[in-house]
Curated annotation (Swiss-Prot):
Pathway: Secondary metabolite biosynthesis. GO terms for molecular function: oxidoreductase activity. Induction: The expression of the dibenzodioxocinones biosynthesis cluster is positively regulated by the transcription factor dibT. The keyword Oxidoreductase applies. Pfam families: Questin_oxidase (PF14027). It comes from the Eukaryota. This is Baeyer-Villiger oxidase GME11358. Keywords: Oxidoreductase. Its EC number is 1.-.-.-. It comes from Pestalotiopsis microspora. Belongs to the questin oxidase family. Baeyer-Villiger oxidase; part of the gene cluster that mediates the biosynthesis of dibenzodioxocinones such as pestalotiollide B, a novel class of inhibitors against cholesterol ester transfer protein (CEPT). The biosynthesis initiates from condensation of acetate and malonate units catalyzed by the non-reducing PKS pks8/GME11356. Pks8/GME11356 lacks a thioesterase (TE) domain, which is important to the cyclizing of the third ring of atrochrysone carboxylic acid, and the esterase GME11355 might play the role of TE and catalyzes the cyclization reaction of the C ring.
């Protein structure tokens, strides 16, 4: 066992957005114990297709928000029954993974998750986790160019895992994240990102005014007005990443790429564009409602929000070259647009947030306490913490030239957090969220107002 295979949380590394100044020693102890068990014994996929193990996300987030030892153990036990054991290790395979051809042949093969993880643990023990992340994610080698798009696959789960590992400075979790990306199915995110980059380069070199840079809010509005995109977005019978791959890209890929390539980031605008991306995700989550139905947050927009915090963390890392950080945020914003389309281009109305009645007025500390006590697999807690982070980084852009790109402001962040908490409390997982909010069928089982 190496340091790169051990979970070792400390009071010095408790994340960017926290629920209080002090975390009990017992909370740290139980988190280390439970996450070590997860690391050693459990698969990062509880099923082969998009079955993502959320235990790390759940415990890190609840710890940061101030959960008690009892709440942390309950959170772990709530989600444990759905998990499965880690695949067997093949040391011969691990030893051969330094060969890029051998490694590349095994990318997207879920049965190699444990082999990938142990390989990355050894690499981290030898080189340090920052060096390994740069080598395998940002070096633009053949392997890195395969793994980086996979980080965004599966509704952002691998990059959420990586962002948390970096935020809490846990090499073992970073090894898990790299292995998850390497073992993950591809849903053609590589094609989407590469095509969008090529489109951006071509428009910059020749360029009509229509290809100029735009905000995510402007691009979403144009997306909703494109008939080809709308027709693809309303394709029935598919959900999530499979719909993106099988319906959106084939039917409206050209039109979507033309718009997505206009979201651009530079080293000078990185901070502002990161905040814009975070704000846009919150806007999607809060505003995609139906006037005749009870409030619900879209399941995939929730993941856009959750991952926005992790991308913000990565965008602030000085050991990642700024050009790579720019690329991270460009890709995130572009894929958020693709998720808006995949979810059926729902109407987005800020009045749903402005007029939401949350009942008792509560501050962030009260909301953190509520979600820490909620029986949930961590989705609500992650969503709420990401919203608080959004409030923190977007406030400086609420006034001035960029303000139109920041519709979520003031107490709206807390309101959206309460929308998620109120609409998921004491409900079974299938009833907590609406799945693809632009589709009429998604709202059939949601109670009328």
């Amino acid at each position: 066992m190496t340091a790169a295979s051990q979970i070792s949380m400390s009071a010095r590394h408790l994340g960017y957005t926290r629920g209080g100044p002090d975390v009990p020693v017992e909370s740290l102890k139980i988190t280390n114990e439970l996450l070590q068990k997860n690391h050693d014994e459990l698969h990062i996929f509880f099923r082969d297709m998009n079955g993502h193990n959320h235990l790390v996300h759940n415990l890190f987030t609840r710890l940061a928000l101030g959960a008690t030892p009892e709440q942390l153990r309950t959170a772990f036990n709530d989600d444990l029954p759905t998990q499965r054991g880690i695949p067997s290790l093949d040391q011969d395979v691990v030893d051969k993974m330094h060969d890029d051809d051998f490694f590349s042949e095994r990318i997207t093969k879920i049965n190699h998750y444990n082999n990938f993880m142990v390989f990355f643990e050894k690499e981290i023990a030898s080189k340090g986790w920052q060096t390994v992340v740069n080598q395998y994610i940002f070096s633009k080698s053949r392997v890195a160019e395969a793994l980086l798009p996979l980080m965004y696959d599966g509704a952002y789960h691998p990059i959420i895992h990586l962002g948390l590992g970096v935020e809490f400075e846990q090499p073992a979790v970073i090894a898990e994240a790299l292995a998850q990306a390497a073992a993950h199915d591809s849903f053609d995110t590589d094609w989407f990102f590469q095509s969008a980059e090529q489109g951006a380069l071509e428009s910059q070199s020749g360029a009509s005014p229509s290809s100029s840079e735009s905000t995510l809010l402007e691009l979403a509005r144009e997306t909703a007005q494109d008939n080809t995109i709308r027709d693809a977005a309303r394709t029935p019978g598919l959900i999530g990443t499979m719909k993106m791959k099988k319906a959106i890209y084939p039917k409206a890929g050209k039109q979507l790429l033309s718009l997505a390539s206009r979201f651009r980031v530079t080293k000078e605008t990185l901070k502002q564009k990161t905040a814009e991306m975070v704000n846009f995700c919150a806007y999607l989550a809060g505003c995609a409602q139906r006037r005749d139905r009870a409030t619900k947050v879209d399941f995939f927009f929730m993941h856009c929000v959750t991952s926005s915090l992790c991308l913000s963390v990565l965008a602030q890392q000085p050991w990642i070259d700024i050009a790579d950080r720019v690329r991270l945020i460009e890709w995130k914003g572009r894929l958020d647009l693709a998720w808006y389309v995949t979810c059926g281009v729902p109407d987005l109305d800020l009045d749903h947030v402005k007029t939401y009645q949350a009942g008792v007025e509560r501050g962030w500390d009260d909301i953190f306490a509520l979600v820490s006590d909620q029986h949930d697999d961590g989705h609500v807690a992650k969503f709420v913490r990401a919203l608080k982070h959004g409030e923190d980084i977007c406030q400086q852009f609420e006034d001035g030239d960029a303000s139109k790109a920041f519709p979520i402001r003031g107490d709206m962040w807390q309101v959206i957090a309460r929308m998620a908490y109120d609409s998921t409390l004491n409900l079974p997982p299938p009833a907590k969220w609406v799945i693809m909010a632009g589709m009429d069928q998604a709202w059939v089982s949601v109670p009328e107002k």
